[in-house]
Amino acid sequence: MEWIDPYLGYDIQVSVNSKKVVDELLERRICGVAHGKAEFGPRALGNRSLLGDPRYDIKDTVNTIKRRQKFRPFAPAILEEYKDEYFEGPMNEYMQFVAKAKHDHSSVTHVDGTARVQVVKKDCGSIIRPILEEWYERTGCPMLLNTSLNLTSYFDFILYM
């Protein structure tokens, strides 16, 4: 059996308007994105993700939405061409390594200043790439908070949106 990619399941093919997603993020809202096939594994890679503005402390809001403990870490999704400006150490598109943040980004790093960085390549094929490009164009920030879109219920998601 050959491993093709980290995606499986139902393939959601809906139009995602990157501009509208970024409009919501700029209002300091947390945005849910569901597009393409679901990721298989422990990390959100952009096809089933909650996204947030990493420039502000939004951890408590996301923890409330997800009903999870405060100590649980978040991760940044960053445009590949900017990863070395913000982090040092091994990084890849599957968040398999821990990198050290070069600057304070407390919304997307652990208490020790490290993060499991998702490097978003130009050819990744995920909706997260055009969202990040729009985000960078409008803010100058090449990353977003990215956590898995696994909520207790549909109501929780609507309640906090």
Regions from the PLM with identified roles:
Residues M1-M161:
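Flexible beta->alpha loop and helix N-cap segments adjacent to enzyme active/binding sites
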